[in-house]
Amino acid sequence: MAVILAVEDDLFILQSLELVIEDLGHNALLASDLAGALLHLEAPGHIDGLFTDIRLFALGSGGYDVANQAIALRPDLPVLYTSGSVLSDEMIGRFVPGGRFLQKPYSSAQLESSLEELLR
């Protein structure tokens, strides 16, 4: 059983992420912004993967900030980004090394597959 930190500012999507993660047999840690993510990242305990929306509407932070802070605290943490924006070279250039991407909208099956791949 893995622990996945999901960061998403849309609470409906965040609740859906929790259900999918738990249906896969994993534990979900949830945050809607960088501050919430840092509470989990700075706490003791293992986190196996980070799933973050690139566009978070909290002032001054986004998924890139979440991922960069996560990697600073937990260098081996695999990261899966998501966004409704079309993936561009600029976006890819801001990914942490090894970062992956899942385009919104995605199906539950696509999310499940991407999360399982992230944890390999």
For each predicted feature, which ranges?
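Conserved phosphotransfer microenvironments
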Residues: D53-N68
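Conserved phosphotransfer cores of two-component systems
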Residues: E42-G45, Q69-L77, R94
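Acidic, metal-coordinating helix/loop segments flanking the phosphotransfer/catalytic sites
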Residues: L30-G49, F57
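Conserved acidic carboxylate
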Residues: E8
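Two-component/phosphorelay signaling modules centered on CheY-like receiver
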Residues: L11-L30
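C-terminal output helix
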Residues: Y106-L118
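As written
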Residues: I92-L102
